[in-house]
């Protein structure tokens, strides 16, 4: 599948590699922090970081997800401020990453550092059918631990 990409920061593809799949089994493309200089992200602080690129999916059967990189979250407490970024197929603006330091220590984010992943996913747009009752199931309305822990 082809997705249109507009490079907004010329350092992408010159100083830093363009997003690519690291292995044949990789699901995500790494997104980089397009910064002019390193920034300090204090514990509890949330900042919005430019990626230097815009992606236009065009096909309404797909959407993009911006997801955290596992190492940053586990080792440094750096996760996405909105937990998951949803990029609709008709969005054409620059991809931005909301970064939240949920850790205990100040984190230094360097220019060009890999910060998040972009994953393309299929989308099914549902049509709601209003009903008075649902067909009964064994589970019913049970949730939030209803099926047990083991």
Swiss-Prot record:
SUPFAM superfamilies: dUTPase-like. Pfam families: dUTPase (PF00692). Pathway: Pyrimidine metabolism; dUMP biosynthesis; dUMP from dCTP (dUTP route): step 2/2. It is an enzyme of class 3 (hydrolase). GO terms for biological process: dUMP biosynthetic process; dUTP catabolic process. Keywords: Hydrolase, Magnesium, Metal-binding, Nucleotide metabolism. Its cofactor is Mg(2+). It comes from the Bacteria. Its EC number is 3.6.1.23. InterPro entries: dUTPase, dUTPase-like, dUTPase-like_sf, dUTPase_trimeric. Substrate binds at residues 69-71, 82, 86-88, 96. It catalyses: dUTP + H2O = dUMP + diphosphate + H(+). This enzyme is involved in nucleotide metabolism: it produces dUMP, the immediate precursor of thymidine nucleotides and it decreases the intracellular concentration of dUTP so that uracil cannot be incorporated into DNA. Belongs to the dUTPase family. HAMAP family: dUTPase_bact. This is Deoxyuridine 5'-triphosphate nucleotidohydrolase. It comes from Acinetobacter baylyi (strain ATCC 33305 / BD413 / ADP1).
């Amino acid at each position: 599948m082809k997705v249109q990409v507009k490079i907004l920061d010329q350092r992408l593809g010159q100083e830093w590699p363009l997003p690519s799949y690291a292995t044949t089994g990789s699901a995500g493309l790494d997104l980089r922090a397009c910064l002019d200089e390193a920034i300090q992200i204090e514990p509890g602080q949330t900042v919005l970081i430019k990626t230097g690129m815009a992606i236009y999916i065009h096909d309404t059967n797909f959407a993009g997800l911006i997801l955290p990189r596992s190492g940053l979250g586990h080792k440094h407490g750096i996760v996405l401020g909105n937990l998951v970024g949803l990029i609709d197929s008709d969005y054409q603006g620059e991809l931005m990453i909301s970064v939240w330091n949920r850790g205990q220590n100040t984190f230094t984010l360097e220019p060009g550092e890999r910060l998040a992943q972009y994953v393309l996913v299929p989308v099914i747009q549902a049509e709601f059918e209003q009903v008075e009752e649902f067909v009964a199931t064994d589970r019913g309305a049970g949730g939030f631990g209803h099926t047990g822990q083991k």
